[in-house]
């Protein structure tokens, strides 16, 4: 940023003994203060600077480099250079148009699955890149459907997100009230005035009488020291008992919606009205979609079986570091990395490039998006697929 460059100029002012390595075409951190003019104006600040262009690329095929060059040459604010390679010409870049984000994600997942099943690639050969973290939801769903192991770099896998774990904890208690971990997780979520002291006393009572935690809560009136908390605890257990009764006459989707409505979980998030809270609501909507799809695709759907399936796919989050898996990440997170096969998803106006960049009066905003696209394209070594939804 400007302050850092001013500091460097002061440090180097006497002896001019300074070496700088950078690529203006990969300057993608304007949003956190990086200033591309530090590179573009470098020779003006250091008159005797010797410039060495490193234009040979050892990573990508000629086809991929040609595409990257075609994109970045549209930028005016850059040092003139053209990447070249002694690598093979390589495969053509695939361009895929989908009806919507889910069809796009389905194409990505099915392509990966087919290539791995036929021995043409390993899961670790693939990276899925996107502009914003929110785009990972549809991709995760389709990868999970095909049992494709994956990791999100710089983000959380779907079933590790707080709101998803909270809702699933309610469902686990309804299915099996002996699940002490689930009970402890949501006894005060959303906040209902049941504190850690109350939980500790209930656990002590449970140990003393051979109960599980939920059974102990049902006996709250008999637990010494919990007289004041008894009403709040009783409201919680009444809520759970009501859900257990309704489970018999409701579909799973109806049950989930009942839990969300009666607990006020979504209402509390909606009241926050922040981007983070709205993102959590969208994740919960995604969970409801998964529940609906499970019911539609299962002959005799049950809460217990659904939770078993969730437990199985959640194991993907605990992958061994040496195992083979697909990586998902934003383009910003991918800078400096390389992968044999790259899917660049969501390449439609308003998403990538972003709406604000398109509408901005500052041409530098769109040039930043173009640099980001250049970074994305040049992550691919062998094959690149660019996709977008109508």
PLM regions and their residue ranges:
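Conserved helicase NTPase motor core
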Residues: 1-41, 56-60, 259
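Short alpha-helix plus adjacent loop in nuclease-associated cores
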Residues: 25-30, 59-60, 152-175, 187
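Helicase P-loop NTPase motor core
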Residues: 47-50, 56-149, 172-176, 230, ...
């Amino acid at each position: 940023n400007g302050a850092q460059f001013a500091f460097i100029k002061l440090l180097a002012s006497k002896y001019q003994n300074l070496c700088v390595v950078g690529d203006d075409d990969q300057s993608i951190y304007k949003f956190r203060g990086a200033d591309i003019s530090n590179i573009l104006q470098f020779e003006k600040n250091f008159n005797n600077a010797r410039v060495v262009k490193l234009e040979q690329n050892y990573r990508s095929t000629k086809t991929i480099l040609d595409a990257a060059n075609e994109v970045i040459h549209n930028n005016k604010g850059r040092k003139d250079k053209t990447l070249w390679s002694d690598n093979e010409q390589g495969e053509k870049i695939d361009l895929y148009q989908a009806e919507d984000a889910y069809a796009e994600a389905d194409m990505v997942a099915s392509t990966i699955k087919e290539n791995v099943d036929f021995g043409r690639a390993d899961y670790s050969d693939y990276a899925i890149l996107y502009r914003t973290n929110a785009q990972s939801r549809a991709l995760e769903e389709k990868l999970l459907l095909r049992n494709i192991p994956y990791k999100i770099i710089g983000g959380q896998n779907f079933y590790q997100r707080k709101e998803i774990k909270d809702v699933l904890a309610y469902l686990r208690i309804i299915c099996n009230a002996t699940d002490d971990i689930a009970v402890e997780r949501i006894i005060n979520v959303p906040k209902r005035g049941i504190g850690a002291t109350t939980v500790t006393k209930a656990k002590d009572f449970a140990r003393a009488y051979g109960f599980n935690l939920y059974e102990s809560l049902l006996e709250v009136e008999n637990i010494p020291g919990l007289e004041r908390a008894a009403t709040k605890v009783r409201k919680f257990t009444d809520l759970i008992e009501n859900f257990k009764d309704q489970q018999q006459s409701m579909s799973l989707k109806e049950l989930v919606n009942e839990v969300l409505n009666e607990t006020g979980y979504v209402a509390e998030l909606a009241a926050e009205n922040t981007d983070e809270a709205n993102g959590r609501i969208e994740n919960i909507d995604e969970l409801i979609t998964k529940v609906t799809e499970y019911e539609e695709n299962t002959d005799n759907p049950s809460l217990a079986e659904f939770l078993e399936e969730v437990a199985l796919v959640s194991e993907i989050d605990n992958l061994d570091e040496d195992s083979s898996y697909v990586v998902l990440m934003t383009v910003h997170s991918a800078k400096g990395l390389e992968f044999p096969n790259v899917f660049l998803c969501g390449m439609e106006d308003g998403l990538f490039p972003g709406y604000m960049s398109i509408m901005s009066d500052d041409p530098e905003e769109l040039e930043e998006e173009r640099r980001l696209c250049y970074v994305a394209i040049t992550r691919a070594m062998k094959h690149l697929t660019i996709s977008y939804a109508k």
